């Protein structure tokens, strides 16, 4: 199974690539946003700032949105989750627009939000068991997603008195504000559960063919 990380050119993606490859996936880095779509799983990583990342994504923004809306499996981490939204107060440029809403600055005295925090499932919208979220995960960010409505939110977290989505899901796209690759064994289990779910769906489609 091919897993492609979109490289915005902003940092070292080694730890994330290593965590994904540990499950036997063929992990590749790609700087051409259009080329990232020739994959089984697209990963929008959590390294960088919104403006430069949006600029890197811009040449294929609509193609990426259409592919995700059509069901291409995608994992979007931290900044990557923020890129699923329409735009951000952090910088110029457009996000993918898969999730209606914007990204805003954290409303907290201590910014950035760095360290371990709880991930609380959002009741009826909680992720399926194959995508069990870690109960505690590692966060590192100064901006948070503000969806127009909560239907796609699968988990929440709170920093001081500021509550915001810890995870969202639309079609086969899962966005998480935390860093799974930095969230110990539970984070790695989340990554492997996501890849296992993609494999299972692909296998089911294959067995259903005449």
Task: Show the residue positions of the predicted features.
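Extreme N-terminal starter segment of soluble prokaryotic enzymes
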Residues: 1-4
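Two-component/phosphorelay signaling modules centered on CheY-like receiver
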Residues: 16-26
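Short acidic low-complexity segments
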Residues: 27-38
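Cysteine-nucleophile active-site neighborhood
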Residues: 48-117
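Pocket-forming structural segment of enzyme catalytic cores
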Residues: 86-161
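C-terminal and late-domain segments of enzyme folds
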Residues: 145-210
């Amino acid at each position: 199974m091919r897993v492609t990380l979109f490289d915005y050119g902003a940092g070292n993606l080694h730890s994330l690539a290593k965590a994904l490859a540990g499950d036997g996936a063929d992990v590749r880095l790609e700087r051409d946003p259009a080329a990232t779509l020739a994959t089984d799983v697209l990963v929008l990583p959590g390294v960088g700032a919104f403006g430069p990342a949006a600029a890197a994504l811009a040449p294929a923004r609509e193609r990426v949105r259409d592919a995700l809306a059509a069901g291409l499996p995608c994992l979007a981490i931290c900044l990557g989750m923020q890129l699923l939204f329409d735009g951000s107060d952090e910088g110029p440029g457009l996000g993918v627009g898969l999730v209606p809403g914007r990204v805003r600055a954290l409303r907290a005295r201590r910014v950035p939000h760095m360290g371990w925090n709880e991930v609380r499932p959002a009741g009826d919208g909680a992720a399926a068991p194959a995508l069990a979220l870690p109960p505690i995960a590692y966060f590192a960010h100064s901006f948070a997603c503000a969806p127009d409505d909560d239907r796609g939110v699968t988990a929440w977290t709170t920093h001081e008195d500021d509550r915001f989505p810890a995870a969202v899901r639309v079609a086969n796209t899962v966005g998480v504000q935390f860093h799974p690759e930095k969230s110990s064994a539970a984070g790695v289990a989340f990554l492997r559960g996501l890849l296992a779910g993609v494999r299972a769906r692909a296998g089911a489609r294959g067995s259903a063919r005449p």
